[in-house]
């Protein structure tokens, strides 16, 4: 079976990108007779004594009138070895955003350089953009070598300069080829003009370049696009989740987790356009059926239980600014489109602007203008499910949309989570002399979430007493109590709350590992906080139960056992959940407690949940 290679051309204006594509299409017999006749006639009308191959792809009237490429032109052609989709991108600096669009799906980029001019700023810019976009294969095509008499020294100088620049980028595969796109030398077949060049022709290289290893087949990521419920007599119980596999391989029977809620289940069936399939991999569009009835909607994601994306509202990214009449400034609000999820976001900060020529980081920059690149920090209103772009381009890329004009203003690539705390490589775990068999059975963690005053601590303490009366070792690990010691250094910003709950989660797993049944009353207002707690327990092999104390805000405020609501309403305290800080209701808690039942009844419901899971 022939494989498909997506490629794009890049480089400065008039370097010959459109001519090169025209040559590839013509020599591979991919130009229709009537189209070729039109190109020949237009060339004659302009007084050329040759056929202008650039006209094959320059389809807009403005392009033909000016002899330049403005929009991105996509063309398809094939050889016996491989199929190709090629994007002809513009070279003018004001159309850099178009180049980003054209190259965003490419697996290989051909960077054309006019041999007479050498490397120009725009050529460097495009090569750098290609590396940012995660493109692993670059071809340096030094064009118009015929105008320099096929000077080997000139070619070697340009090649060495480009390779020195590429060495500073994250690109491993760079191939340099001397060509003449107009005359076809070294484009489809090797040329007699370059006996000193021992490499392949351009087309031969495109046919043979290895791309099978570029796809991420390890990290299962399935963003849900649509929930299928036929509502017919024949399929009245059918529920499946449609989308495109972003990465990894899914098979029927696999254990998976639904994010951001963190529920685990199994795949029972996978359906493709023509019926059931044994497995699904990128870029297949399929629908997935699960063993359990879970509340899943567009924007959620299915992943492996022990291989999950980062769930966060705060992240750093490299962005390319594309707006003509606006600039990117910290504090501005935008819409983020990421996989199948669309959320509001704010630019929390601009770390630096990047000079693509020198790769210098200008930390004094206060804004990004058209075609400029920089590193920014973003905060979204609801969590996103992210991977680092270099690891997974599908879940590591996004666009920014202006909410006023609905126009795309930036393309972004998610960077590594530098805030994530990882142990030093010099820190080694100590193995206990006591084995798991010597200890009491592992305990469990019950995580109580809800607004302040919803009854979390009251129910948890009553459950603790009832369990101790039954001879079961139970302990209430109260988040407020930890703030008097271990977490005394933390405030109530979202970042500090996330760290507070991270520490709380790890302490809970240690207690549960000793055989205690741990009861954790903690507001944990965001879904990402609760998902993090569940993940920490899953990684430690500890059973985790989420209990939602579903007490309405007005009831909590009426109770106000600590007087905090009154202080929040008076403006004496800020970042108070339910007043000036959000609370995201759990979609699928393991247990929902409502105030229409007494505290004693609620405590018994929790105990019943634990006993049913034993």
Curated annotation (Swiss-Prot):
The keyword GTP-binding applies. One of its GO terms (molecular function) is GTP binding. Residues 11-18 are annotated as: G1. Its EC number is 2.7.7.4, 2.7.1.25. This is Bifunctional enzyme CysN/CysC. Residues 1-441 are annotated as: Sulfate adenylyltransferase. The gene is cysNC. GO terms for biological process: cellular response to oxidative stress; cellular response to sulfur starvation; hydrogen sulfide biosynthetic process; sulfate assimilation via adenylyl sulfate reduction. One of its GO terms (cellular component) is plasma membrane. Residues 2-217 form the tr-type G domain. Heterodimer composed of CysD, the smaller subunit, and CysNC. GTP binds at residues 11-18, 88-92, 143-146. With CysD forms the ATP sulfurylase (ATPS) that catalyzes the adenylation of sulfate producing adenosine 5'-phosphosulfate (APS) and diphosphate, the first enzymatic step in sulfur assimilation pathway. APS synthesis involves the formation of a high-energy phosphoric-sulfuric acid anhydride bond driven by GTP hydrolysis by CysN coupled to ATP hydrolysis by CysD. Residues 442-614 are annotated as: Adenylyl-sulfate kinase. Keywords: ATP-binding, GTP-binding, Kinase, Multifunctional enzyme, Nucleotide-binding, Nucleotidyltransferase, Transferase. The active site is at 524 (phosphoserine intermediate).
